[in-house]
């Protein structure tokens, strides 16, 4: 486990620090493709929201639940509660639920932050949410890596 002091502000990777009981969101993460201040909310929740929600689940996963609020090593929750809580806090589901709840409020500011983008008018807001989520994990692999690694089932 690393503490907050071991991270650089220019990192573009969120993390949960069990030692500090804190979510680390370095400044390097608050830029494209993860965040854009004026981007529609479906893109922000689909990308950065999902990433941060995922990292928050580490507070209750197997290693994370062994630290208390002061960073001391001990089991603070019974395993049965841990399993049910972890299932409910899945990053993608939590971010999607939060975004949908925000939309349900229906004020004009929320509506304005969910306008469709030019060139993407054929997609629904829900589709764009999941496209933003998928874009987080997309990358271009060199051909030799694609051919040397057969497709595998990974959770």
Q: How should these model regions be labeled?
A:
Residues 1-49, 56-155:
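Zinc-dependent metallohydrolase catalytic domains
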